[in-house]
Amino acid sequence: MWKKRKEHLIPLEKSKKIIYLEKRGRRQEKKSVGAICFAVLAVLCLLYCLTIALFMGYGTAFFAVWGALAVVCGLVSFVLSRKRLMQKLPRVLKIMVVICFILGLLCFGVVEGLICSRFAATAQPGADYMIVLGAQWKNNGPSYVLKKRLDKALEYLQENPDTYVIVSGGQGSDEPVSEAQGMYEYLSEAGIEEERILLEDKSTSTYENLYNSSSLLDKGKDRVVLVTNNFHVYRGEKLAEKMGYMHIEGLAADSYPAMLPNNMLREFFGIIKDFWIGKL
């Protein structure tokens, strides 16, 4: 009789089943540190996105990326907080995700370090030409970042009366005049002689700013000072060097502190894109 019963017994390895008991009350299972961190990041990204949209002036819709980051961080937090779901995920997949995350952080850190390395860029006196990169021109005058560039350019031009300046930037759909025309009027009204100001009013990007401006000078011989905001100097210099400017120096203007995280993140993607397509 014992033998018959034994024949109907299910092997131990086939009968194993893990039962998770849901913890309730004060002894409820605590959230993982990773889930909490990503939840906090999601809230911060969402708040920053809304702050830019509601209270700060912005020239592009890039700030929406912070909203997308909030969604991604929220989803990651949700997954990390679900123990059963984490148990079901293949180990190989989890290892690959962790490796990609670490490599992404390293890449981000290196690029941001390069950007920060040119935050305080200064230029030697006596340049032949200066190029002021364009930015949004509003109905009531230059945007904050463009005004900072123009004021920094004005300081250098007043101290170096033999330097010519190229103001570079076309007219966007939301701009009353071309950026170059607006900058021309700003500098001339500040006392810079009109014959020293050259206009390049067709460009729509940093690359085009530099490419179109190169026809107004000699890239191989002339010393050129490139004026832009601190977060933008590194990319501007590298684009110019790749384009054949042999004597290029960045001159860093200040930027709006509250918008710096947004501008730094945008520069990161800009550098990655330009490197990918061979412009850097």
Task: Outline where the language-model segments fall.
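A transmembrane-helix-recognition feature enriched in membrane-embedded lipid enzymes
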Residues: L260-L280
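Cytosolic-side transmembrane helix boundary signature
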Residues: A68-C100
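Short, positively charged and aromatic/hydrophobic N-terminal segments
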Residues: K3, L9-I10, K14-L21
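Membrane-embedded alpha-helical segments of integral membrane proteins
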Residues: V33-S81
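A structural signal for short, hydrophobic/glycine-enriched beta-strand patches
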Residues: V110-M264
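Structural signature of transmembrane alpha-helix termini at the membrane-water interface
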Residues: L47-L54, L75-R82, L106-S117, I272-K279
